[in-house]
Amino acid sequence: MPLPQKKRWESMAKGLVLGALFTSFLLLLYSYAVPPLYTGLASTTPEGAAPCSPAPREPEAPTSANGSAGGCQPRRDIVFMKTHKTASSTLLNILFRFGQKHGLKFAFPNGRNDFDYPAFFARSLVQDYRPGACFNIICNHMRFHYDEVRGLVAPNATFITVLRDPARLFESSFHYFGSVVPFTWKLSGRDKLAEFLQDPDRYYDARGYNAHYLRNLLFFDLGYDSDLDPSSPQVQEHILEVERHFHLVLLQEYFDESLVLLKDLLCWELEDVLYFKLNARRASAVPRLSGELYRRATAWNVLDARLYRHFNASFWRKVEAFGRERMAREVAALRRANERMRRICIDGGRAVDAAAIEDSAMQPWQPLGAKSILGYNLKKSIGQRHAQLCRRMLTPEIQYLMDLGANLWITKLWKFIRDFLRW
């Protein structure tokens, strides 16, 4: 073989070897960053770990935030079970701001922005955890384990979560996470969602890597078997258990009404629940679900559908108890306040594509292989009174976690690799 050609083949061989080694490293890193699915409730927390022992707190001045005659004291011990694709990042921002404003103690994951999801939550996964440690707010993604979470917060902590119409949630999850669910790679048509829903059993394998993202994701996030037989009595038992564990279940479709109920429950002020939509997709990235596809998606996610129906009914009972007219007044007040903040804070008054975001600190996390998540540009001239609040309201989840002191070395390393490879 001529010498130049031999050198070219040697160079190609070295490139292939280096490429194989680098790919292996990425797979190893990803397997560490996204742990395998555990179906049991085995905990990594040592047996007999001491429960939370909160220190006595100085009594606070009562507030009349909710219009009650005697006033009430704001609640500061909160567990937010952060479900996927439910506007939960917007709720997270609300909790981050409240905790930061009042100097509260967050239970953060150690190394990444979730608690080793999809593994079950365990106390030992909390950054700087020590037996007996007590936290005010737990709010990052996890697979819920009530007993483990309960051991980290005060006995009177408020538990909340948020649900979404299961068909809409499935569509969002399918497009956001589909690239990391290998069995979807077999889908070849232009409309992969429609192709999948034509015959989901042909593609779906409950044992497949990241399969949980594409069936009954709410049920899974809440700690239950997402492939449970719909006729099993356990389904209703699990739904009733959720009702016992959570003081309020919010609904994404009625987000403003949900925040009014949350404000009332927690005895917070209106400013505490102001928000901008975070982690939202651009309109062109949201396909329409036709009537037939909607029906198929609902049937495929039947456990989530039963869960949602149950809490949709209980939600409106809470609204009735709150008072329809009072609810309408408070929703209107919230929307006026949000609109005022939009005019004060947001350059151009609306969300923009990732490419149009000028400050890297405002860049939201994007799904693998896409730039579909919108973000914001902060106005350059904001009065001193609102400057801090505006920035906090617009800061994406990952950046806000780092601002609050969370150790995200795995997340940051993964982002560096994605940026380097332009994924």
Curated annotation (Swiss-Prot):
Protein name, entry field: Galactosylceramide sulfotransferase
Lumenal topological domain: 36-423
Protein family membership: Belongs to the galactose-3-O-sulfotransferase family.
Membrane topology summary: Single-pass type II membrane protein
Gene Ontology CC annotations of this record: Golgi membrane
Pathway in which this enzyme or protein is active: Lipid metabolism; sphingolipid metabolism
Reaction(s) the record says it catalyses: a beta-D-galactosyl-(1<->1')-N-acylsphing-4-enine + 3'-phosphoadenylyl sulfate = an N-acyl-1-beta-D-(3-O-sulfo)-galactosyl-sphing-4-enine + adenosine 3',5'-bisphosphate + H(+); a 1-O-alkyl-2-acyl-3-O-(beta-D-galactosyl)-sn-glycerol + 3'-phosphoadenylyl sulfate = a 1-O-alkyl-2-acyl-3-(beta-D-3-sulfogalactosyl)-sn-glycerol + adenosine 3',5'-bisphosphate + H(+); a beta-D-Gal-(1<->1')-ceramide + 3'-phosphoadenylyl sulfate = 1-(3-O-sulfo-beta-D-galactosyl)-ceramide + adenosine 3',5'-bisphosphate + H(+); a 1,2-diacyl-3-O-(beta-D-galactosyl)-sn-glycerol + 3'-phosphoadenylyl sulfate = 1,2-diacyl-3-(3-O-sulfo-beta-D-galactosyl)-sn-glycerol + adenosine 3',5'-bisphosphate + H(+)
Known function: Catalyzes the transfer of a sulfate group to position 3 of non-reducing beta-galactosyl residues in glycerolipids and sphingolipids, therefore participates in the biosynthesis of sulfoglycolipids. Catalyzes the synthesis of galactosylceramide sulfate (sulfatide), a major lipid component of the myelin sheath and of monogalactosylalkylacylglycerol sulfate (seminolipid), present in spermatocytes. Seems to prefer beta-glycosides at the non-reducing termini of sugar chains attached to a lipid moiety.
Record region (Disordered): 48-70
One GO process term, biological-process aspect: glycerolipid metabolic process
Cytoplasmic side: 1-14
Keyword presence, Lipid metabolism: yes
MF-aspect GO terms: galactosylceramide sulfotransferase activity
Top-level class of the enzyme under EC nomenclature: transferase
Glycosylated sites: 66, 156, 312
Keywords, comma-separated and alphabetical: Glycoprotein, Golgi apparatus, Lipid metabolism, Membrane, Signal-anchor, Sphingolipid metabolism, Transferase, Transmembrane, Transmembrane helix
UniProt entry tagged with the keyword Transferase: yes
Transmembrane segments: 15-35
EC number: 2.8.2.11
Pfam families found in the cross-reference section: Gal-3-0_sulfotr
Cellular compartments annotated: Golgi apparatus membrane
Organism: Bos taurus
